[in-house]
Swiss-Prot record:
GO MF assignments: glucosamine-6-phosphate deaminase activity; identical protein binding
Organism: Borreliella afzelii (strain PKo)
Site entry (Part of the allosteric site), positions: S151, R158, K160, T161, Y254
Gene behind the chain: nagB
Protein name: Glucosamine-6-phosphate deaminase
Signal sequence interval, chain numbering: none
Modes of activity regulation: Allosterically activated by N-acetylglucosamine 6-phosphate (GlcNAc6P).
Any Gene Ontology CC annotation: cytoplasm
Family: Belongs to the glucosamine/galactosamine-6-phosphate isomerase family. NagB subfamily.
Keyword vocabulary terms for this entry: Allosteric enzyme, Carbohydrate metabolism, Hydrolase
Length: 268
């Protein structure tokens, strides 16, 4: 697993956007050979999305032949609800780029048969040959998507009950009212994410420091689902300095030394 440490959230966002854009450019997607991209919601990727929008508007990258799969969606709120992940993605990314609507895939939290919705999502991902690059963020407790502590590290797309910690953390998007936060969601599983050819995780802020420590320095543990990345052959965590405060000095120095030549990844 690689760890790229950048000074600020802005630097992290730029690095992540450049990495995604470079992967798409290198693949040279076409209509018959699309690039399959997994995407997150939440506060962590917003800066990356802003940078990708600028790269798209400047003509450096196109999303016309990119097919996206989002990680998760709340159960029981309408797609046009301002805090649904459908709304989030259109507001912060999709409406600003040249992606085709038919190439966007987001779980339907209002499907009549939620279990079937999850099964069909898995089948659709597999029908495209799997996800080439899955971008994600993590919660303070180390969860990826809505794979809360205790989730199976081989789990697939499914219905998940949210922990009180996650509900409290997400209440900032619901006027600070925990009672307005949905109590369950549909989410891709850890196994779904781990099947991706490459995983890129964005980590920023002091409140993610303990999760990053468990991801990098501790053992694999289903109570810290981010730790599953240790088993992936091509996983990258890009972190700001604030999130590294619980790492050992030697760990930080080690990764800074071996990744120094990769700090500047501006598009060529």
């Amino acid at each position: 697993m690689r760890l790229i440490i950048r000074p600020t959230y802005e630097d992290v966002s730029k690095w992540a956007a450049n990495h995604v854009a470079q992967k798409i450019k290198e693949f040279s997607p076409t209509k018959k050979k699309p690039f399959i991209l997994g995407l997150p919601t939440g506060s962590s990727p917003i800066g990356m999305y802003k940078n990708l929008i600028e790269l798209n508007k400047s003509g450096k990258i196109s999303f016309q032949n990119v097919i996206t799969f989002n990680m998760d969606e709340y159960i029981g709120i309408e797609q046009n609800h301002p805090e649904s992940y459908h709304s989030f993605m259109w507001k912060n990314f999709f409406s600003h780029i040249d992606i085709k609507k038919e190439n966007i895939n987001i779980l339907n939290g209002n499907a009549l048969n939620l279990e079937k919705e999850c099964e069909e999502y898995e089948k659709k991902i597999k029908s495209f040959g799997g996800i080439m690059l899955f971008v994600g963020g993590i919660g303070p407790d180390g969860h990826i998507a809505f794979n809360e502590p205790g989730s199976s590290l081989t789990s697939r797309t499914r219905i998940k009950t949210l922990t009180q910690d996650t509900i409290i953390a997400n209440s900032r998007f619901f006027e600070g009212n925990v009672n307005k936060v949905p109590k369950s969601a549909l989410t891709v599983g850890i196994g779904t994410i781990m099947d991706s050819q490459e995983i890129l995780i964005i980590v920023n802020g002091h409140n993610k420091a303990r999760a990053l420590k468990h991801a990098i320095e501790k053992g694999i543990n289903h109570m810290w689902t981010i730790s599953a990345l240790q088993l992936h052959k091509n996983a990258i965590i890009v972190s700001d300095k604030n999130a590294t405060y619980e790492l050992k000095v030697g760990t930080v120095e080690y990764f800074n030394d071996i990744e120094r030549k990769n700090f500047n990844n501006d598009l060529k």
